[in-house]
Amino acid sequence: MRSATYRPPGLVLTEHEFEVPVDHARPDGDKLTIFAREVVPTGRENEDLPWLVFLQGGPGFEAARPTKPGDPVWLEPALKDHRVLMLDQRGTGRSTPLDVDGMPPDAQADYLKHFRADSIVRDAEFIRVELGVRQWSVLGQSFGGFCVTTYLSLAPHGLAAAYITGGLPPVDRHIDDVYRATYKRALARNHAYYARYPDDRDRVRTLLERLESEDIRLPSGDRLTAR
């Protein structure tokens, strides 16, 4: 573990880097670096505060980069009685990036399966043990909520509490049922939108035709498509 501490106004930020296995079932195999930022209010860095781990949504988004106690907005109330750990999940932010360039398809699929919620949870457990924390709480937003429920399944012994603000897996339902309901809801919302703004129908159609006929790129270099 490597650490460095910074002190923006109102906060003490300690940045940690942990070396974890790509495949936790093969601890002697290839390694990844996981980045996590510990956040505590100024003047309370030496207190024995309970830990709260934030699991970001996405998947594919890094954790927020706080510059003050109220950024993001949930951070300030959380810091009243917690030491917050903001985790860049594997493949995101300052953790080892996800790179499958040059791999054959089978190797890509085998590598990508190690970037799911189960591996993210095992990373968190590795970090908990490394930091010497007996138990901590987790807060999951969107995809982070799926990570929280996976955490409850795989390592409940490591948790004092679990909070979900979005991303709750269905119970006794197949994911296809959820998507069928989602598509119907999206279609209904589209009808409602165009009923209110009928002139936008031609505008959107023009945009779709342009996306089909032109190679328009996002800042990441990926092509922007209509699908």
PLM regions: where:
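Gly/Pro-rich cap/lid or specificity-loop segments adjacent to the active site
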Residues: 2-221
